[in-house]
Curated annotation (Swiss-Prot):
Record-marked site positions (Important for activity): 83
Further remarks about this protein from its record: During catalysis, the active site Cys acts as a nucleophile attacking the alpha-carbonyl group of tRNA-bound glutamate with the formation of a thioester intermediate between enzyme and glutamate, and the concomitant release of tRNA(Glu). The thioester intermediate is finally reduced by direct hydride transfer from NADPH, to form the product GSA.
Any matching Pfam family: Shikimate_DH
PANTHER family from the UniProt entry: GLUTAMYL-TRNA REDUCTASE (PTHR43013:SF1)
Recorded name of the encoding gene: hemA
CDD domains: NAD_bind_Glutamyl_tRNA_reduct
Reaction(s) catalysed (UniProt annotation): (S)-4-amino-5-oxopentanoate + tRNA(Glu) + NADP(+) = L-glutamyl-tRNA(Glu) + NADPH + H(+)
The entry's keywords: NADP, Oxidoreductase, Porphyrin biosynthesis
Protein name: Glutamyl-tRNA reductase
Source organism of this protein record: Methanobrevibacter smithii (strain ATCC 35061 / DSM 861 / OCM 144 / PS)
Pathway the protein acts in: Porphyrin-containing compound metabolism; protoporphyrin-IX biosynthesis; 5-aminolevulinate from L-glutamyl-tRNA(Glu): step 1/2
Record-stated family: Belongs to the glutamyl-tRNA reductase family.
Subunit organization: Homodimer.
Length: 399
């Protein structure tokens, strides 16, 4: 069974998502313990949290999967795969067509593979999903002129501050999302751009790319009080900025705009008590909706590609199901060949002269027979002929 647990921007705001994600983590742990789940991929981004699970023992009627929190979507089978294909194609993103999700899914798969909990089935599904995302982007205009969460945050800042020219901006976080923010800011002719990251050399690298200035994390307060705009996008599990931290500085924050695009959030809402204008991922929805309208006509073509690739994947699953049978068949036939070859050689008077000839002959015969049988097995798999597959498997079982 393929099982998907998820929460995303479509069904929950950022505040709810943080809490639901914790519930979902707990639900996954309970399922993992009960069903000994070893094959799974976890995806966590700024506006979604998902688990993809492959386990043939899970009971769909289990009370654990009748979860009380309706904001956790629990999905099974083919619809899970199609959802993943839509996601890698950018159709499920808040910013439709954005390219970052493709890298995020690829990273999640690689992490699962490295940690040895991405088996043959999930590896096939995710490899195909990444391929689908690339094909959709190559064959449609879904990502033409595409914006990202980072550039959408900069657009939001311009709506509230006007032109960013000669403004002083602090970017907190120099990871992938922080780099997207910085890339969008680089075109704005700023007065100054400062980059803060917990690992200082990473901040230095990004700041150098922008002709900006790197900031030590423990000196953040000094730069907060001089900034016109702060955009935060770290992977921290806790708040980076809150009212208490701001009060320790001498700044006047009544004209300060903060945009928090992290999940979990980096900036506590209590900073608003000091006059800060604070926005988060939920506030990007208006920009996201405008972007979706521009790309709506690309949806149908993308969906057609998804359907075609899904059909190809389903066909490949049929072959995966008989791979072990074919491998065992090959071993069984080779064992027979070796035994019979040894018997024949033992009866020869001039062993050295004839052994190699007999070995090559029997090997050639087995290869030809094996090719024909394996071809029939694959054909039976494509035609869903389970009876023939089981018959062949039974014939070559170890007795």
């Amino acid at each position: 069974m393929i099982l998907n647990l998820r929460v995303d921007h479509k069904i929950a705001n950022i505040d709810a998502m943080e809490n639901i994600a914790k519930e979902m983590d707990q639900l996954f742990l309970e399922l993992q313990e009960k069903y000994s789940i070893v094959e799974y991929v976890e995806i966590s981004t700024c506006n979604r949290k998902e688990y993809y699970i492959h386990n043939d023992n899970i009971d769909a009627s289990d009370s654990l999967l009748s979860h009380e929190n309706k904001s956790i979507i629990i999905d099974y089978g083919d619809s899970v795969i199609k959802h993943l294909f839509r996601m890698t194609s950018g159709l499920e993103s808040m910013i439709v067509g954005e390219d970052q999700i493709l890298g995020q899914v690829s990273d999640a798969k690689q992490k699962a593979f490295k940690e040895r909990h991405c088996g043959k089935i999930l590896d096939s599904i995710f490899t195909k999903a990444i391929h689908v995302g690339r094909v959709v982007r190559n064959k449609t205009n879904i990502n033409k002129g595409s914006i990202s969460i980072g550039s959408a945050a900069v657009d939001l800042a311009e709506k509230h501050l006007g032109n960013l020219e000669n403004k002083s901006v602090l970017v907190i976080g120099a990871g992938k999302m922080g780099k997207l923010v910085a890339k969008a800011l680089a075109e704005k002719n700023l007065n100054a751009i400062f980059v803060a990251n917990r690992t200082y050399y990473v901040a230095v690298e990004l700041a150098n790319d922008l002709n900006g200035h790197a900031v030590l994390f423990n000196e953040l307060g000094k730069y907060v009080q001089t900034a016109d705009l702060i955009i935060s996008a770290t992977g921290a599990p806790h708040y980076i900025l809150n009212k208490e931290r701001l009060e320790k500085t001498d700044g006047d924050f009544k004209d300060l705009l903060m945009i928090d695009i992290a999940n979990p959030r980096d900036i506590c809402e209590d900073v608003c008590e000091l006059g800060v204008k604070l926005f988060n991922i939920d506030d990007l929805r208006e920009i996201a909706d405008e972007n979706t309208k521009l790309r709506k006509k690309e949806f149908a073509e993308a969906e057609n590609i998804i359907d075609e690739e899904f059909s190809l994947l389903k066909e490949s699953f049929k072959l995966i199901g008989v791979e072990d049978i074919i491998a065992n068949l090959r071993v069984s036939m080779e064992n027979i060949r070796e035994r019979e070859t040894e018997k024949a050689i033992a009866k020869l008077s001039d062993v050295d002269a004839n052994a190699k000839i007999i070995d090559n002959l029997t090997n050639s015969i087995v290869n030809k027979i094996f090719f024909d049988i394996s071809k029939k097995i694959k054909q039976a798999a494509h035609e869903n002929d389970e009876e023939l597959i089981r018959a062949i498997e039974f014939m070559f079982e170890e007795k």
